[in-house]
Regions:
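Accessory interaction regions appended to the cores of large information-processing enzymes
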Residues: 2-218
């Protein structure tokens, strides 16, 4: 006589998905209240310049869900440190990492301790405040602060090293990077510039350094 097959019921996970906000009802049972939006992968570049040559910020970012390719890339970068291009999180100060998690990657190969101190001091602080400004202004929904991440390619002009210690305008440098951070995040979250704008202005916008090259400056 053949034995009846035993039906195995799937075991439900005690945890709720990343994208679901859990709340307790009157009996204490957990139920999904709302599904948070996923943003996929978004990118942007921005430029903000100050009055002095070294007061220039040109971030390029990739922003997306931590449980997707952006999260994988971010974690890989943290674990794959390279001499001269150390990756660090944006922080208000030691022991106070900002949210969304923002990983800074230097575009410049760092060889100077003074450059490091400026990059991981004034510039890092400016970026950290810019990220929080973006949340405060509603550019990044507060509800997504723990579920998305930012990979932030940061530019600090090496010309800053030609300025004597004590003569660098750290307040202005902080402000430039703070403003650039808000600007680049706003562009990424808003898919700016739009494809319509790009097609309309393709022949009206000329790359600055291409123009310099045509003028014989390089």
């Amino acid at each position: 006589m053949a034995k009846a097959k035993k039906t195995v019921k799937p075991v439900k996970s005690p945890t709720t998905p990343r994208s679901v906000k859990a709340v307790k009802d009157a009996k204490g049972a957990i139920s999904p209240a709302s599904v948070l939006p996923r943003i996929g992968v978004r990118t942007a570049e921005a430029l903000v310049e100050g009055e002095l040559g070294y007061l220039c910020a040109e971030p390029e970012i990739v922003i997306g869900d931590l449980d997707g390719p952006v999260g994988t890339a971010l974690a890989t970068l943290v674990g794959n440190q390279v001499a001269g291009h150390t990756k660090v999180f944006a922080i208000l100060n030691s022991d106070a990492q900002v949210k969304p998690a923002t990983l800074m990657v230097s575009k410049v190969t760092v060889t100077s301790s003074r450059y490091t101190n400026i990059l991981m001091g004034t510039v890092q602080a400016g970026i950290a405040h810019g990220v929080l400004d973006s949340v405060r202004q509603g550019i990044i929904p507060k509800a997504l602060a723990n579920s998305i991440g930012i990979i932030y390619s940061v530019w600090l002009d090496p010309e800053v090293l030609k300025v004597s210690p004590g003569k660098v305008d750290h307040e202005a440098l902080f402000a430039v990077h703070r403003e650039a951070t808000v600007k680049v995040i706003k562009k990424a979250m808003g898919h700016e510039p739009s494809i319509d704008w790009l097609l309309e202005n393709q022949d009206k916008v000329e790359h600055y350094f291409h123009e310099c090259g045509k003028q014989g400056q390089f």
